[in-house]
Swiss-Prot record:
InterPro entries: RREB1, Znf_C2H2_sf, Znf_C2H2_type. A zinc finger (C2H2-type) spans 66-88, 97-119, 125-147, 206-228, 233-256, 314-336, 641-663, 669-691, 697-720, 751-782, 788-813, 1251-1273, 1400-1422, 1520-1542, 1548-1570. This is Ras-responsive element-binding protein 1. The keyword Transcription applies. It is found in: Nucleus speckle. It comes from Mus musculus (Mouse). Residues 163-174, 1155-1165, 1564-1580 have a biased composition (Basic residues). Residues 1097-1111 have a biased composition (Polar residues). Signal peptide: none annotated. There is a cross-link at residues 433, 500, 549, 564, 591, 611, 613, 622, 855, 883, 911 (Glycyl lysine isopeptide (Lys-Gly) (interchain with G-Cter in SUMO2)).
């Protein structure tokens, strides 16, 4: 967009008629020539440098009305004119990409995407050098050229003077004249007071005024300055804040006589970029006047300036100040001499003349030597009123005790000096605190009449802290009992107003730690390092300082403490000096203090009575020092609590405590996706919207959505000219959304129970509630663990208050004030919850446990700076893995590929949230012996078969019993506990130990569990150990995700956006972006478990129960039919507590297919997500993508984006049958979207530099474009890729790259193992075909289709059913020929004990073999054939799935499992194509072009996925149309072959077995089998049978390949949809009844079915009720249709998968 297109100029207003008109005219000329409004985009040279002024002038002239230059229409506002003019541009077809907000027509969808950023204010592209952000990558790269120039001549252009500075639009083309202005980062310009310095050297270095870092480039400096945004421009002495560095420097120089200094402590003025250059500001006076030297001297001493000229440099050597003339400099130098000498003399005199004791004595009497009081003019006289006093108080970072009369007006050091002789608390006491004092740079002399004189200390030496004279002056001038109005009565509001903005982080500069003092003599610095601003030691956070009360009590307190500690008063001073080191507690203790209440300084009430003060005991002191937690006197509520790190003042200590957390980096409100730490929940909610793309505030006028209300208001003001608050509010619509709940899910650690998700509202209630979990033994805690104990009788209590109550009642001798010390917080020794490591750490850190230090774990587990720390007296809880990289991040089996998708998500990190990568194969536990190491919970734990059924209870509160199930198991940990649990969404693990450890122990308690079959990457909050310890093991993300309690997802930390291949597998870039974003968005269930089953899997439906979403059926609940393993119960989960959970089973395929469409939120949630490998592509719709954004804008322009959401609801409403047609309809009905997608694809087509998207054919000129585009791809790719490699463990001959068996599957027997492998292949095929079909269904997410091919296929029950269908029909034909009675046995018994029988059954066709070798050869035959079957099955998948759904939920679990197995069949488009190609090779042979047709069909498929063009657009090019089903074909030959599927004609006949084939090459292949069969009779038979199945599926697959959209058939006969469902259910019943019929009946029925088999396969959608297949099915139903088995026997069903 040109800089002079009005909309293009984001930063400038829309008022430039002239500019706009030129753009319009150019557009008009372009459009006349047939071009699209590209003219708007072609950058025109911007007008001259004064164009802004000129434009404004013209605007003023023409403001009254706006005439369209093309049609003379008069518009009232410029915005209307712009909108109107754009309507002139729509005739070229650009209207397809018109902006719904401003009407601008754009050439392509991607241009529109970019343009929408203008309205949204998003700036996705950031300059790597200076961080300035841009809406388009082109602008960013244009901007980057400036840096290239900058490196050579950094500032050839003068920065603007402060008067000229303005916010520049980030859209500015920073070229030509624009460079003459300062292109500071838009939105981020830091006004750091640089004024124009035209003569800077080209190689000048820019210094950060805060930390003195050097930068070559001004942009770097400006960006860097943002890192100091949390270090507000505040005076360290008087806490006044400034907008600019210049203001602060000026203030410091003027008021505090303080100059900026560099890191070495030298004056830093002449090279300081923050200081303006030149003396032009002195122009207010005539330089020729006689007093000019004096004026300029005075002015330059307070207004720091830099010399510009090398010839005329008049700089003071002492203070580095510059002056405009020599005489000014000479005058200035004189000012240095007396000041320095005077101070030196004064210091030596004072130190020599009097001893410290004498001064202390005088101070006690309120006296001081007259020579100590320097007559300094009072610069400001504060009135003696509340507000002044409050202000004065707030000038100190450290809170003082309000009871001290002088403390309000005296700096901490002075207060320290007010007391009696030196008070030192006994060094052994735990309440030795550090005192971080700030530089004593300004004193207040309190005069006897209570007036306060502010006495500035002049000169640089003011920075020194231990200025004893000043301290003593302050002390001496304070009358002993001065009375000041109590702060509690002061109004709080003025203060709140004064300290308006809370800058985020960083304590104020430094304050050297001092010991706590209540003495008159100033304590020496503990740390020799003199505090110059910025040298704070990170390890010494300022501690709260509480003072003893007045000077008189101080003395008594001193004596009291001295007598207790046995110190004589005379030795106090030496003691103080000697003990400086002793009193420095170790860092751990400091950390503890930080984490305890002393984090928050609380001002104690002013009106404490003297008698209380005189009776100060150690307990009281301790309470005062640590900040009383619970028992505050009522007055305390009225005290104000200022923040030590910033200006804010709080009325409640709790609020302050929460606020301080944000400074310390331990805020519970941390973003899980990035490193953002919010000060409060609201800020976090706002921040999360940037990730989720959620925009709850909608402009009612143009329906544009905004993330933040302020933006919406600004939009209304600027775009719709709404001026009044009422108008603005009236036009903002708020759409409530789940973000707040999401935030609650992971950032309300203080109230939400991690185990059951209950929101307890109060943290204390939560802590007590957590004990109920512990007492159940969920986490392996002691069953009745009670954290509080009575010191007298050791009685344990659940709550502290109970213990106090007990002490009050039972131990009457305990004085009330000491009760607190009689409550012991027991953090028991090495309980089951503690690992050896913890014990060790506990030992190291010391064992003195006082109640103050044994606060509930949560207090200490708040992460600081990204890592969790624990109190010194507390071990790291066992759930915090000591290692930063858990072993579980990598597969335990060293033959498997490393999985780096979990890298960096170690439990120690704050933001990891993946429920671990459970990457263990059966061998992994054996491989990794962790008996000698601390138990690392990050290693995935093996699953016990029995536990698989304890599926996540759908109810939030059900987990406990199930986790409890683990209890009875042997407590010894398995050789390798491999369940890694990320216990808390934030890693801040704020729940007490037991809670979190629950998961751990649950994991530990299952020694003989079976190793997990695959890696599960659940992005699910861990609410319950049951959820964690069982569900992830099951790989049942669906269950988790559908669980209402769990719909608040965790967000794993996103990996880098650009592709970065990991070690062994190519991990596509966004391993978890989809998870992140979809989880943030309203469809959290888009995340699917990552299933990679390296090991062998078991029989078909073993994951059935586990995978069914809500299923919480315990083992026992499995239906009787499943005698073998209750795991395999196919019964629908009874416990699905919400319709959504139940949906996946009942709606089955319907839900799934619908959920595949983009924007499908509910569908997605319903989806079982069986073990699907990846995130559904739909989740891309949930990203903060432009498309989603546009979808929210209510305009038909983007109906393609909105369409899916509508379809979604329609489909879900319509139920199963409708679903099959939905996709096809969508397919046909979205040509507009095709155009969008086509345009999207072409938007960068002709760019020179081409970066290919790894997931789709799109090409991008910049990495940033690719990054943005990558957001449209989900996680699936990475998952599937990840799966690919483990898949290699299996020998899936024909599909080398394809998939490992299902994750949830646990192995039952070698036979069943083989079955599983076989089935995996069987399912793989359908999934593949299904994927292709999906692509047809969803033209919109074309790019994503690829990804979805693998996932979607696996997700849906339909795939299975499809494979069932195709295999059923094949089986019928095979059965007819071979009359295999055993097959019946195989199929019927496959679900029963037959699995364990020595016979080896083929899971695809049910055939039994005596020898395993025979079976494996037989399977190889299937592996060749099944890809075809898969393809064939696909067309029917959806219909069949629906049918099954109609019939009953039974199939749904089975499909869930099957696809899981077939999950990774097509991990990547490449693989998929490879497998298709392979099929083609196998199937093609020397045929009459059938192969070609098939290949061509594949071609169709491939382009369909590869190019964003949808199938519909391609269909037009195919000229041959089937008269029956209206499908189109490339050639007559293809059509002829296709017609055979309608006619049932099978012209090719095998001479040996008289079997007939639709395709010639099928016959040829079949005959090869006979040749092999001569060598091995059994094998021949098998392969023949396989071959037949393959041939059937081939003709079907040809059909489907050539016309992928088999739904079209269904569409053509809408009325058949219901019927289809019925026939499918017939097939279902056929499958089950098939099992129950006698072999003869079955054979007969299947013979009858055989002719129709190909027909059914070819076009399941159009199955005629009277078709032979239907008749056959009816026959079979007559044989024995028993619904219960259908429901319960998925095992058998899944084995029939290949047979029916």
């Amino acid at each position: 967009m040109t800089s002079n297109s009005p909309i293009g100029l984001e930063g400038s207003d829309l008022s430039s008629i002239n500019t706009m008109m030129s753009a319009v005219m150019s557009v008009a000329s372009v459009t006349e020539n047939g071009g699209s409004p590209q003219g708007i985009k072609s950058p025109m040279k911007p007008p001259g440098p004064n164009r802004i002024g000129r434009r404004n002038q013209e605007t003023k002239e023409e403001k009254s009305s706006y005439n369209c230059p093309l049609c003379e229409k008069i518009c009232t506002t410029q915005h209307q004119l712009t909108m109107h003019i754009r309507q002139h541009n729509t005739d070229t077809g650009g209207a397809d990409h018109a902006c719904s907000i401003c009407g601008k027509s754009l050439s392509s969808a991607s241009s529109l995407d970019r343009h929408m950023l203008v309205h949204s204010g998003e700036r996705p592209y950031k300059c790597t050098v200076c961080g300035q952000s841009f809406t388009t990558n082109g602008n960013m790269h244009r901007h980057m050229k400036i840096h290239e120039k900058d490196t050579n001549s950094t500032t050839a252009a003068a920065p603007p003077s402060p008067l000229k500075r303005r916010r520049l639009s980030s859209k500015r083309k920073l070229s030509h004249d624009a460079e003459s202005e300062d292109p500071g980062p838009a939105k981020k310009m830091v006004e750091d007071g640089q004024s124009g310095d035209l003569d800077k050297m080209s190689d000048e270095i820019f210094h950060c005024p805060v930390c003195f870092k050097e930068f070559v480039c001004k942009y770097e400096l400006e960006t860097h300055m943002e890192t100091h945004s949390d270090n507000p421009l505040r005076c360290d002495i008087c806490c006044v804040t400034f907008r600019t560095h210049r203001g602060l420097l000026r203030h410091n120089a003027l008021v505090h006589k303080q100059l900026p200094r560099d890191a070495m402590g030298r004056p830093f003025i002449q090279n300081n970029p923050s200081i303006p250059a030149g003396f032009h500001d002195l122009g207010f006076t005539d330089f020729s006047c006689r007093k000019f030297p004096r004026i300029s001297q005075a002015w330059c001493e307070t207004n720091l300036r830099r010399c510009i000229s090398e010839q005329h440099r008049f700089v003071c050597d002492t203070c580095d100040k510059a002056f405009p003339m020599l005489s000014s400099l000479i005058l200035h130098r004189q000012s240095h001499i007396p000041a320095d000498q005077g101070r030196e003399k004064l210091q030596t005199k004072t130190l020599a003349a009097e001893s410290l004791e004498q001064k202390a004595f005088l101070a006690l009497l309120g006296l001081q030597h007259t020579k100590d009081v320097k007559p300094a003019p009072a610069e400001e006289l504060l009135p003696d009123d509340n507000q002044a006093i409050q202000l004065q108080t707030l000038k100190y970072q450290l809170p003082q005790e309000p009871g001290c009369p002088t403390v309000l007006s005296v700096s901490p050091l002075d207060a320290a000096s007010l007391g009696g002789s030196l008070t030192v608390l006994p060094a052994t006491k735990e309440n030795m605190k550090h005192l971080s004092l700030q530089p004593f740079q300004k004193g207040f002399i309190i005069q006897p009449d209570s007036s306060i004189v502010v006495k500035p200390i002049s000169g640089e030496s003011a920075i020194e802290l231990a200025d004893i004279q000043q301290i003593l002056k302050m002390a001496a001038s304070a009358p002993p009992q001065i009375s000041l109005p109590p702060l509690s009565k002061a109004p709080a509001t003025p203060l709140q107003a004064i300290f308006k903005h809370m800058p985020p982080l960083k304590p104020k500069p430094l304050v050297t730690p001092r010991t706590v003092v209540a003495a008159s003599t100033p304590p020496p610095l503990i740390n020799a390092q003199q505090a110059s601003p910025g040298c704070i030691s990170p390890s010494l956070p300022p501690q709260s300082l509480k003072f003893l009360k007045g000077s008189v009590e101080a003395v008594s307190n001193v004596h009291l403490l001295q007598s207790k500690s046995g110190i004589q008063p005379s030795t106090t001073t030496q003691l103080f000096l000697q003990q400086a080191g002793v009193e420095l507690p170790g860092q751990p203790e400091m950390k503890t203090q930080l984490e305890q209440e002393s984090i928050i300084e609380a001002l104690l009430p002013l009106n404490m009575e003297a008698k209380i003060k005189q009776e100060i005991t150690e307990g009281d002191l301790k309470a005062i020092m640590t900040g009383p937690s619970g028992k505050k006197t009522p007055a305390m509520r009225k005290v104000l609590y200022p923040c030590r790190f910033c200006n804010q003042v709080f009325a409640f200590s709790g609020v302050l405590r929460a606020h301080v957390r944000s400074h310390l980096g331990i805020s519970p409100y941390q973003c899980n996706i990035c490193d953002y730490i919010a000060a409060d929940k609201a800020a976090l909610i706002r921040h999360i919207r940037t990730h989720s793309g959620e925009r709850p505030y909608i402009c009612k006028i143009c329906h544009y959505p905004f993330t933040v209300k302020a933006n919406c208001e600004r939009h209304l003001r600027k775009k719709h000219l709404k001026a009044t608050r009422k108008d603005i509010e009236k036009n903002i619509e708020y759409v409530s959304s789940p973000t707040a709940e999401l935030v609650d899910a992971f950032c309300a650690p203080e109230t939400v129970c991690r185990l059951c998700g209950e929101d307890l509202k109060h943290y204390r209630a939560l802590r007590i509630h957590m004990r109920t979990h512990c007492s159940r033994g969920l986490g392996g805690c002691h069953k009745g663990r009670k954290p509080f104990e009575c010191k007298e009788c050791n009685a344990p209590f659940v709550a502290k208050r109970n213990c106090i109550h007990h002490i009050l009642k039972q131990h009457l001798h305990v004085p009330e004030k000491d009760i607190e010390s009689y409550v012991l917080a027991t953090n028991s020794g090495l309980g089951p919850a503690d690992t050896p490591t913890d014990a060790a750490s506990r030992g190291e850190e010391g064992s003195c446990v006082t109640f103050a230090e044994c606060k509930p774990l949560a207090t200490f587990l708040e992460p600081q700076n990204g890592f969790l720390h624990s109190s010194p007296t507390q071990p790291l809880p066992s759930h915090i893995s000591v290692k930063l990289e858990p072993a579980s991040s990598f597969a335990m089996d060293f033959n498997e590929p490393l999985d780096f998708s979990q890298k960096g998500l170690a439990l120690v990190q704050v933001k990891q949230e993946n429920v671990s990568s459970l990457l263990t194969s059966s061998s992994s536990s054996a491989l990794y012996d962790c008996s000698m190491e601390p138990i690392d919970l990050s290693i995935p734990k093996s699953v016990k078969k029995g536990d698989k059924d304890t599926v996540v209870p759908s109810d939030a509160k059900k987990p406990e019993p199930e986790a409890g199930q683990a209890e009875p198991l042997s407590p010894r940990p398995p050789p390798c506990p491999t369940l890694s649990v990320t216990v808390e969404p934030k890693g801040s693990l704020e729940t007490p130990t037991g809670t979190v450890v629950a998961v751990t122990t649950a994991a530990k308690l299952e020694p003989h569990t079976q190793p997990l079959q695959g890696s599960v990457q659940l992005a699910v909050p861990i609410y319950s150990p049951a959820l964690v310890s069982n569900t992830p093991l099951l790989g049942n993300s669906a269950a988790l995700l559908n669980n209402p309690a769990l719909l608040r997802p965790l967000r794993p930390k996103p990996p880098l956006l650009l592709p970065k291949p990991s070690m062994t597998e190519e991990l596509p870039p966004l391993a978890s972006i989809a998870q992140i974003i979809s989880s943030v968005s309203s469809a959290p269930t888009l995340l699917k478990t990552k299933v990679a089953d390296p090991g062998p899997s078991i029989t078909s439906s073993n994951t059935v129960a586990t995978d069914s979403p809500g299923s919480s059926i315990p083992k026992a609940a499995a239906t009787p039919t499943d005698t073998t393993s209750s795991k395999e119960s196919s019964e629908p989960p009874p416990a699905a507590s919400s319709p959504e959970e139940a949906l996946p089973t009942e709606q089955g395929p319907a839900a799934t297919s619908s959920s595949r469409k983009r924007g499908r939120k509910r569908g997605l949630r319903n989806r079982p997500l069986p073990n699907s490998s990846a995130v559904d592509l739909d989740s891309s719709g949930e990203f903060a993508s432009i498309e989603k954004m546009l979808a929210t804008t209510d305009t038909n322009k983007f109906s393609p984006f909105l369409q899916t959401a509508e379809d979604d609801t329609q489909e879900e409403v319509a139920g199963a049958p409708a679903d099959q047609h939905g996709p096809a309809d969508e397919e046909q009905g979205s040509p507009a979207e095709d155009r969008l997608l086509r345009a999207k694809r072409n938007s960068y087509a002709n760019c020179l530099q081409k970066i290919n998207c790894p997931h789709c054919p799109r090409v991008f000129p910049w990495a940033s474009s690719l990054q943005r585009h990558m957001l449209t791809h989900t996680d699936s790719q990475s998952d599937t890729d990840t799966l690919t490699t483990p898949g290699e463990v299996l020998d899936l001959t024909a599909q080398a790259k394809e998939q490992p068996p299902a994750e949830g599957a646990s192995e039952i027997s070698p036979a069943s193992q083989d079955l599983a492998i076989k089935e995996a292949k069987a399912a793989a095929a359908p999934s593949e075909e299904e994927e292709e079909k999906e692509t047809e269904e969803n033209p919109e997410p074309e790019e994503e289709c690829r990804v979805e091919e693998s996932t979607g296929a696996a997700d849906a029950p339909e795939e299975d059913t499809a494979s069932n269908q195709s295999l059923d029909l094949d089986f019928a034909t095979k059965l007819m020929d071979f009359k295999l009675a055993e097959s019946e046995a195989g199929s019927v018994d496959s679900q029963g004990p037959a699995q364990q029988e020595p016979k080896h059954a083929c899971d695809t066709c049910g055939k039994n073999f005596k020898f395993l070798g025979t079976l494996s050869r037989h399977k190889k035959a299937h592996s060749c054939q099944e890809p075809k079957e898969e393809e064939a099955a696909a067309p029917s998948l959806e219909n069949e799935g629906v049918g099954r759904a109609v019939e009953g939920p039974s199939p749904s679990p089975e499909p869930e499992e099957k696809p899981a197995e077939s999950l990774a069949i097509d991990p990547t488009p490449g693989t998929r194509e490879a497998s298709v190609a392979k099929q083609n090779e196998e199937t093609e042979g020397p045929t009459d072009g059938e192969g070609t047709a098939e290949k061509r069909g594949d071609g169709d498929k491939r382009p369909k996925t590869d190019s964003p063009k949808s199938m519909a657009s391609k269909a037009d090019k195919r000229k041959k149309v089937c008269s029956v089903c209206n499908k189109r074909f490339w050639s007559l030959q293809d059509l002829t072959r296709h017609m055979r599927s309608h006619t049932g004609e099978r012209p090719y006949k095998c001479q040996t077995c008289e079997r007939t084939f639709t395709l010639k090459h099928s016959l040829v292949r079949h005959q090869r089998i006979h040749q092999k069969a001569r060598h091995s009779k059994h094998h021949g038979k098998d392969s023949d049978k396989d071959e037949r199945a393959e041939e059937d599926s081939e003709d079907e697959s040809t059909h489907s390949a050539t016309n992928p959209a088999s739904e079209n058939e269904a569409e053509s006969a809408p009325s058949t949809s219901n019927h289809v469902a019925v026939t499918r259910s017939r097939k279902e019943s056929l499958s089950t009844s098939g099992k129950e019929c006698s072999p003869e009946e079955r054979a007969a029925a299947e013979q009858a079915a055989e002719p129709s088999a190909p027909k059914e396969q070819a076009s399941p959608g159009e199955t005629d009720p009277q078709s032979p297949a239907a008749i056959v099915q009816d026959l079979l139903e007559l044989c024995g249709k028993r619904p219960a088995p259908i429901l319960a026997a998925t095992d058998g069903a899944s084995q029939l998968l290949g047979m029916e």
